[in-house]
C-alpha cells in the first residue's frame, strides 16, 4: 500500500535488532509470511540476502519446499516454509481426531530425518499462537519442545540459521510469485486482511494520508500511525471465520462489523489530528515538493554522519591534491645587477 512506509519500517526493525543483539539481519521474514516478487525486490535493495515465504502449493507446484530457490531477477535466496510439518505442530498437535495424534518429539524428528535424498533442510515456522492459543499448556506442547533437541541429537538432525542454509545452498532454480502470498488459510493469500469491503475501505482511508503523516513532527501522531497499521486491526474485520477457516480468532470484538466501527471511529479522530497540521487544502504536488526537500536533507545527513564516522576512526576525509607552486625567482641586489650590466656591455 505504501512502498516508502514499508521500507522505513523494515529499516527501523533492522536497527532495533542491531541495537539489541549486535547483529545485522540478512534474511527477511515479513508479517504473516507475506511475500511477492515485488517485495523481494524491495528487500534486496535494502541489503537482505534471503527471504522466508510460504511453501504454497500453487506457487511450488511439483517442487519441494525443502530446497532453496532464487528470485527471478534480483540476487535473493528464497526459503519456503514446509507447511505440513509446521502445521502438524501449530494446528494438529492438540487435535484428538488427527490420525497421528499424539504427536511426540521422537515421532516428529523421525519425519524430519526421513526427508528425500537431496533435501538438506526443512523450514518449520509458526507464530506464538502455537503456544497457549492453539495448544494450551496442559496439551504437553512445552514438554514437546523441550524434548526436540535431544531427539534431534539422537537422529543426527542439526539446527541451522537461515543464513547458514543460504551459505550452503546450491540450488539455482527460480521461484516466481505473481500476487502476494501468505501463510493464512487454504488460499495462502491476503484475503484475511483485505478480502472484504470493510477492510478495503479502512485500508484506503488510512493510507490516503501517508504522505501527510510523514511530514508530521508530532510524536503522538507518529506513534498512533504505526499502531493503526497493525495487521490485527484488519484481521479482526475478516468475515472468513464464519466459514470455519483458520482465520477464526479470539479477538476483542463480537463481530467483524464491531471491529470495523471501532477502528473507523479511532481513524476518524486520527485523520482530524493530521488535518490540523497538514490540511487537505494542501495539494499533492506541494506535498511531494516538501517530501523531496526532506529526502534530500536526509541524504545529506547520512553523508555527514559517514564523514563523522571516518573522522572518529582516524581517517581524514580525502582532499583534492594541490599543484606545487612555481619557485620564486631570487632578487639580486641592485649594485650587482648594475655590475652585471656593465660586464655584458664591455668589449
Describe each region flagged by the PLM:
Residues 67, 72-76, 80, 95-96, ...:
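Active-site and substrate-binding clefts of carbohydrate-active enzymes
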Residues 7-14, 40, 109-112, 145-149, ...:
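Generic structural signal for well-ordered alpha-helices
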Residues 3-11, 23, 44-83:
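Acidic, His- and aromatic-enriched active-site or binding-groove loops in soluble protein domains
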Residues 29-35, 56, 165-166:
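Short, solvent-exposed turn/loop segments enriched in Gly/Ser/Thr/Pro and often Arg
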Residues 3-32, 111-125:
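CE4/NodB-like, metal-dependent polysaccharide N-deacetylase domain
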Residues 313-347:
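Intrinsically disordered, polybasic Lys/Arg-rich low-complexity tracts
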Residues 1-6, 23-31, 89-104, 132-139:
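The substrate-binding groove and active-site-proximal loops of carbohydrate-active enzymes
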Residues 38-48, 63-66, 169-178:
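Substrate-binding cleft/loops of secretory-pathway carbohydrate-active enzymes
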